[in-house]
Amino acid sequence: MATLNFRSRTWQVALLAFLCLLLGMTSLFLIAGASIRANPDERTRKLNGDELIVNPIGSVTHAITIRSASRDVWPWIVQMGAGRAGWYSYDFIDNGGHRSADRILPQFQTVGIGSVFPAVPGAKDAFVVLQYEPERSLVLGWVPPGEHAPITTWALVLEDLPPGCTRLIERGRVRSPYRPYGLPEWLTKRLAPLAHAVMVRKHMLGIAIRSETAARDRATTGCPRSLTH
């Protein structure tokens, strides 16, 4: 009787596809109450970093209202990354099992073009800071060795909402050559946004909760509860 080789690339790709599908289907139940839905204007208008990938095969936009000022949200964003403050998401997936920080870490408050926010522990080239405007926007991306343009970009944009609230808008874009683990393009188009939604929901709510808690402790928020996520 023939035995199945679960170490073969075919099985690895199949397993990855199944996991992506499972995560994607889970996201359908989570997103309904996730409070990360971008409004029509946010989904269609141009954001910083869009020009880096002109014709993406995929683009997803999420947004959340945070009950603290943008100046209080920004420190949580600039310290992100595995081995840094974490991604405020599922730490066993993207932070080596180490719990994401629940305080501002002064050693990670400096950012510059080329700074690395490791996607996972040990990563050296993803994600790299491609653009930034203090307290306004951060654009991360991955430029593979030998490439001159990013294959994927991730923009985080902060917009002030009176009084004392912030709208965090995040957009991920992928250009055609990017096919993780050799997955076919059609599968990448369908599964990647769904799987991404699971992670980004946790991540965005993590930023919101941490920022709001810190602002509340300092009694610095003037944002009415009616505007929250």
Predicted regions and their residues:
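N-terminal Sec-pathway targeting helices
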Residues: 2-20
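Glycine-rich portal/gate segments that line the openings of hydrophobic small-molecule binding cavities
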Residues: 15, 45-57, 65-71, 78-169, ...
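Short acidic N-proximal helix/loop "leader" segments that mark the beginning
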Residues: 15-61
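A solvent-exposed interaction/effector surface
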Residues: 26-31, 35, 150, 160, ...
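Short glycine/proline- and charge-enriched loop/turn segments
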Residues: 184-188
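Second-shell loop/turn segments in exported
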Residues: 189-194
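Short, flexible loop/turn segments with low-complexity composition
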Residues: 216-229
